[in-house]
Amino acid sequence: MHRLTLLAALLCPALATAANCSLPTTLDQRQFTNLSDPLYAPDNPNAGRMVQVSFAGSQYVLDILGTDLRIGGSYHYQRLTLHTAEIQMTEAHPAGPTHYTLLLTCLSDHQGRFIYTQHDGPIAPRQRQNSGRWTLQP
């Protein structure tokens, strides 16, 4: 959790002041395409993975592109500032529940960066962080 705070403090102010953008007030009926940073590290087993996330009400469906894997879950979205937001997610992964947070910053109204923090989950390491890019579909 301390790494999330440190990364947010380092990344968000620079991105927020450099961009004239805003994050949506709600994710209901919206869809993201996310690409994790491609550099492999032992604490980033999903490096380079692209997913599509569809939100409806308090539920989401995550499709791991290039695979047949589709995972559902619940989420809570909160826009923290015009340029930053947090999504708390609980995923119903086939190997067991995964709890994670996405911290979003925008570069434009439809694109930005995210920091993924897994608090607990079935895929080792159980706690980890990585980052990537998000694109909000029109």
Enumerate the language-model features and the residues they cover.
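Positively charged n-region of N-terminal signal peptides that target proteins for export
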Residues: 1-4
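Beta-sheet ligand-binding and adhesion/scaffold domains
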Residues: 86-138
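Short, hydrophobic/aromatic-rich segments at coil-to-beta transitions
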Residues: 26-33, 57-61, 82-89, 111-113
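Tryptophan-anchored aromatic micro-motifs
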Residues: 19-47, 75
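Hydrophobic h-region of N-terminal signal peptides that target proteins for export
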Residues: 9-18
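N-terminal glycine/threonine-rich, aromatic-flanked beta-hairpin/loop signature
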Residues: 42-80, 112-122
